[in-house]
Swiss-Prot record:
Organism: Streptococcus agalactiae serotype V (strain ATCC BAA-611 / 2603 V/R)
Membrane topology: Multi-pass membrane protein
Keywords assigned: Cell cycle, Cell division, Cell membrane, Cell shape, Cell wall biogenesis/degradation, Magnesium, Membrane, Metal-binding, Peptidoglycan synthesis, Transferase, Transmembrane, Transmembrane helix
Biological role stated in the UniProt entry: Catalyzes the initial step of the lipid cycle reactions in the biosynthesis of the cell wall peptidoglycan: transfers peptidoglycan precursor phospho-MurNAc-pentapeptide from UDP-MurNAc-pentapeptide onto the lipid carrier undecaprenyl phosphate, yielding undecaprenyl-pyrophosphoryl-MurNAc-pentapeptide, known as lipid I.
Coiled coil stretches, renumbered: none
Subcellular location: Cell membrane
Main location as per UniProt: membrane
Family per record: Belongs to the glycosyltransferase 4 family. MraY subfamily.
NCBIfam families: mraY (TIGR00445)
Any one of the GO BP annotations: cell division
Cofactor(s) needed for function: Mg(2+)
MF terms (GO), sorted A to Z: metal ion binding; phospho-N-acetylmuramoyl-pentapeptide-transferase activity
EC assignment: 2.7.8.13
Protein name, UniProt field: Phospho-N-acetylmuramoyl-pentapeptide-transferase
Length: 336
């Protein structure tokens, strides 16, 4: 445990040192920054804020994880197979996000990768994770509240759905200052507790390291944000959470621990479906939420959508509290 804490502190310090240099480089090169939703007017002032900050905390987390995982394995208390499985997912999804951000920022291609291109790359990455790290482990049953449902090779489709789905869910959640970074920290702390109780110290190590790196990033990402993580960070973090839940054989827990991401994604899907349905029935499309993902709905009028506008800090606090509450419920189900 001491080794994990030390590694987490190192990741925090390195990220805090590296991010200002990344921001300075970004500004010196006059690289185009983040584009904002015009519908949320309080965000317009953020236009041009450096993005792709996830590149920094991912590089730090991956390097520190690699070094300390090797140290841990030499002490005969670590499993490099599980560690490399999770880290490979983080790396590959980070590369996909980096490519998407690069096209948006450096090539001035507004949408970056097309949805078809991004989904294809994510599916390929998910398949690599399954065939290289999941299939050799012999895992073919889904844990549903402690009951294992044997699905055989259909587990491959579940892995794809889980990893791709949550990578995009965290990506959707990353819409206001600090929301995604601390939401993921809350999720990782919860999985850290689960890993500790399972004596999976190899997984605990990389969890603590990513927590340290994310907290270092949050120093510059809280409101008013000096840098955003970009798709490079959010896609990698979502995939990491999915991979951890699979590695710990606690797949179902991510529906609770990741409730905020699930709800954010569901709000978008419901909004689109309801708009299309009402337009087909009445000729006029109607909306359930003021704007999606859900955090924008809160910004524009609170929970009801009809109240006063919420500040980003208030939205953050509300959704972080939900994340903590759902994580506590998960731990209660597991251990009480």
């Amino acid at each position: 445990m001491f080794l994990s804490i030390m590694a987490g502190v190192i990741a925090f310090v390195l990220t805090v040192i590296a991010i200002p240099r990344f921001i300075k480089f970004y500004q010196l090169k006059k690289i185009g920054g983040q584009q904002m939703h015009e519908d949320v007017k309080q965000h317009l002032a953020k236009a041009g804020t450096p993005t792709m900050g996830g590149t920094v905390f991912l590089i730090v987390a991956l390097l520190v994880s690699l070094i300390f995982s090797i140290i841990l394995s030499k002490e005969n208390s670590g499993n490099l197979g599980a560690t490399f499985g999770i880290l490979s997912v983080v790396l590959i999804y980070g590369i996909i996000g980096f490519l998407d951000d690069f096209l948006k920022i450096f090539k001035q291609i507004n949408e970056g990768l097309t949805p078809k291109q991004k989904m294809s790359l994510q599916l390929i990455a998910g398949l690599i994770f399954y065939f290289v790290h999941v299939l050799p482990s012999g895992t073919s049953a889904i844990n549903i509240f402690g009951f294992y449902l044997e699905v055989g090779y259909l587990y491959a489709f579940f892995v794809l759905f889980w990893v791709v789905g949550f990578s995009n869910a965290v990506n959707l959640t990353d819409g206001i200052d600090g929301l995604a970074s601390i939401s993921v920290v809350i999720s990782l702390i919860t999985y850290g507790i689960i890993a500790y109780n399972q004596t999976q110290f190899d997984i605990l190590l990389i969890i603590v390291i990513m927590i340290g790196a994310l907290l270092g990033f949050f120093v510059f990402n809280h409101k008013p944000a000096k840098v955003f993580m970009g798709d490079v960070g959010s896609l990698a973090l979502g995939a990491m959470l999915a991979a951890i839940s699979i590695a710990l054989r606690q797949e179902w827990t991510l529906l609770f621990i990741g409730f905020v991401y699930v709800f954010e994604t569901s709000s978008v899907m419901l909004q689109v479906a309801y708009f299309k349905y009402t337009k087909k029935k009445t000729g006029v499309g109607k909306r359930i939420f003021r704007m999606t993902p859900f955090h924008h709905h809160l910004e524009l009028g609170g929970v009801s959508g009809k109240g006063n506008k919420w500040s980003e800090w208030k939205v953050d606090a509300f959704l972080w509290a939900i994340g903590i509450f759902m994580s506590a419920i998960t731990l209660a189900i597991l251990y009480l």
